[in-house]
Structure formats: C-alpha cells, structure tokens
From Swiss-Prot:
Entry protein name: Uncharacterized protein TP_1032
Naturally occurring in which organism (per UniProt): Treponema pallidum (strain Nichols)
Main location: membrane
Compartment(s) where it occurs, according to its Swiss-Prot or TrEMBL record: Membrane
Spans traversing the lipid bilayer: 25-47
Superkingdom of the source species: Bacteria
Pfam families: NusG_II (PF07009)
Xref: Gene3D superfamilies: N-utilization substance G protein NusG, insert domain
Keyword Zinc: no
InterPro entries listed in its UniProt record: NusG_2_sf, NusG_dom2
Keywords, sorted A to Z: Membrane, Transmembrane, Transmembrane helix
Lineage: Bacteria, Pseudomonadati, Spirochaetota, Spirochaetia, Spirochaetales
Disulfide bonds: none
Length: 144
C-alpha cells in the first residue's frame, strides 16, 4: 500500500465555498442564525404564556348565561323549564348534584375540569362548559 493511496482515501473532496470564505460566517449565515433564534424565542413565549391560565365554568340555560371561576368553591342553582338544577364547584371541578330530569345522566356524568369538557341536562336545558387556557395537560383529540 502506497502512502498516497492512504492519504487520498482519508480526505474528503475540498469544499470550494468554505475555502473561498476562509471558514468564516457570512452575513446571510448570521441572518439565518438570528432568524432561528428569534423564532425559537417567539414560539417559547406563546407556549409558556398559555400555560396555567384561569379556567372558568360557563353555565347556560335558555337565553341566560353565567360564568364562574373554577378555583372558587360554591353551589349554584339554575332554574330551568322543569325546575332547579344544582351545580357544585369544588377542587377545580364542576358537577351536577341535583336535577329534576327523569334519567339523571347529567348527575352520573363525572365532574368537568379540563378546558373543553362539558356536561348538559338536556331535559332541563342547562349546559356547562369549561373555558380557559389550560395547556398544562394536553391530550390527544381522540375517542376514548
């Protein structure tokens, strides 16, 4: 094996653009790096800004609408066409405690606490929906 063969096999072809610049960054390289850093900071700002937002419970009955924070415990009574529906907010979640409906599906429903969750007493026309920004617990949008 000759020395020249070994040397040729271990070296890569010359990069003429890098050689012409002398291995230095150009103005365009600096702009690309600055753009990537700016986009990273911008996206991080929006991701962290949305975390830990206040969640509220939106209750609707007919044309009436009420909004309550989920971090304050209380019992709410809403009068619907069939009678009074009782809603309890406790430990950051809301549930229907009592309702005059015959089937009681709204009472059996688990408490709503995450943004986008809802419950309804259809016979009495009472709807509960959780609003806010809660990116702390992202979930896949799928049927479970």
């Amino acid at each position: 094996m000759a020395c020249g063969e070994n040397e040729r096999a271990s070296t890569s072809p010359p990069n003429r653009a890098a050689a012409a610049r002398g291995g230095r960054l150009t103005l365009l390289d600096g702009c690309c790096v600055a753009l990537v850093l700016a986009l990273t900071a911008w996206s991080g700002f929006f991701v962290y800004r949305m975390q830990g937002g206040a969640r509220t419970l939106d209750i609707r009955c007919g044309a009436q609408r009420w909004t309550y924070p989920l971090d304050q415990e209380r019992v709410i009574r809403v009068r619907g066409p069939l009678g009074e529906t009782e809603i309890e907010i406790r430990a950051g979640a809301a549930r229907v405690c009592r309702s005059p409906c015959a089937n009681g599906t709204c009472i059996a429903h688990p408490p709503v606490q995450r943004v986008g969750e809802w419950n309804a007493c259809l016979p009495n026309g009472v709807f509960l929906y959780v609003h806010g920004t809660d990116a702390a617990e992202p979930e896949a949008d799928a049927v479970q």
